[in-house]
A protein has these predicted regions:
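Glycine-rich beta-to-alpha transition loops that act as phosphate-gripper elements at the mouths
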Residues: 17-19, 66-72, 88-92, 108-113, ...
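Vicinal oxygen chelate
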Residues: 204, 213, 253-293
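Structural preference for beta-strand elements that scaffold enzyme active sites
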Residues: 11-15, 38-40, 61-65, 84-85, ...
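Core segments of cupin and vicinal oxygen chelate
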Residues: 27, 44, 209-237, 249-252, ...
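Catalytic cores of alpha/beta
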Residues: 27, 71-81, 114-122, 159-174
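Conserved N-terminal beta1-alpha1 strand-loop-helix module at the mouth
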Residues: 1-82, 101, 161, 189-204
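N-terminal beta-strand motif that seeds the catalytic metal site of vicinal oxygen chelate
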Residues: 3-17, 203-224, 231-244, 293
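Glycine-rich phosphate-binding active-site loops on the catalytic face of alpha/beta enzymes
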Residues: 89-95, 128-138, 172-194
């Protein structure tokens, strides 16, 4: 899985400002418990480099981006510390050229067609749309992306649980950046349980899992059948199971695999654009199905 594929299945990258590197590992652990093994650590404080280094050492599989990288020196420091991606609020040609020369994955910020075309002239296929809401939000991004069908965006700025899905539904959006689950006061007070819970809520909202129907086979007790039948549950002589609808099947599959579910490769279905639309997981003698809403 390449970097863009990892970003796509992750869907949401927490944007973090850490005042002290001593909070870095606990924060990453809290995010992971909530379902997100990713973070953009911003170079808005002197703790960024060491924070990246500590997280990379403790959690090697964490998707780590360095944010607010404004110069070549910070790009080098971030990558040496263990970052896997350089992100900046704007497009500084000198920084982009330096990153490309060094082989660093880089995602500069853009707000106009001119900046998009400059990014494309460097051979980039993914950019950051920042500040997303202040620049017109979903409506602006739809218009901005229209002429550039192969370009992907990571909108960041003003995104929260209320508008996240409206961005992720856009075909041009690879993933989103957000900070509402990693608020500064929660980090400063060490309230990592709250960060875990907010992260879990964000992931649940992003996946949008909803039980659509369930099936019980003939081995289930008659009384259980009777009561479950009143709830609209179906019955089958072959298997027990449940079917959930979700916002994005590929993303939901990835998250379920992270939680230990075993996918059934014989039950994958794709649409004409090769996007996963249906999947199934083994759950003992039962089957859990996923389908796109």
């Amino acid at each position: 899985m390449n970097l863009n594929e990892k970003l796509a299945v992750t869907g949401l990258v927490p944007v973090v400002k850490l005042k002290s590197a001593d909070s870095a590992v606990a924060l990453a652990e809290a995010l992971g418990k909530g379902g997100l093994k990713a973070a953009e650590i911003t170079f808005r404080t002197d703790a960024a480099e060491e924070s990246i280094r500590r997280i990379a050492k403790e959690f090697p599989d964490f998707l780590l981006a360095a944010g607010t990288v404004l110069n070549c020196e910070n790009a080098d420091r971030a990558m040496d510390a263990g970052a896997g991606l350089i992100v900046s609020p704007g497009l500084n040609p000198k920084v982009v050229e330096h990153c490309i020369k060094k082989g660093y994955p880089v995602m500069p910020g853009i707000t106009s067609p001119s900046e998009i075309e400059l990014a494309m002239s460097f051979g980039l296929d993914t950019v950051k749309f920042f500040p997303a809401e202040a620049m017109g939000g979903v409506k602006m991004l739809k218009a901005l992306s229209a002429p550039y069908g192969n370009l992907k965006f990571m909108p960041t700025g003003g995104i929260d649980s209320g508008n996240l899905q409206s961005y992720l539904e856009l075909p041009c959006v690879l993933c989103c950046g957000g900070s509402w689950m990693v608020k500064g006061d929660l980090i400063d007070s060490g309230n990592f349980d709250a960060i875990t819970e907010l992260t879990r809520q964000a992931v649940d909202s992003m996946l949008g899992l909803k039980l659509e129907r369930a099936t019980l086979n003939s081995n289930c007790g008659a009384e259980l059948k009777e009561h479950c039948g009143k709830l609209g549950m179906e019955f089958s002589d072959k298997e027990c199971g449940a079917c959930f609808s979700c916002n994005d099947v590929q993303r939901a599959v990835w998250y379920m695999e992270q939680r230990g579910f075993e996918i059934d490769p014989t039950r994958l279905e794709y649409d004409s654009k090769h996007r996963l639309t249906k999947a199934a997981f083994k759950a003992g003698n039962a089957v859990i199905r996923l389908e796109k809403k």
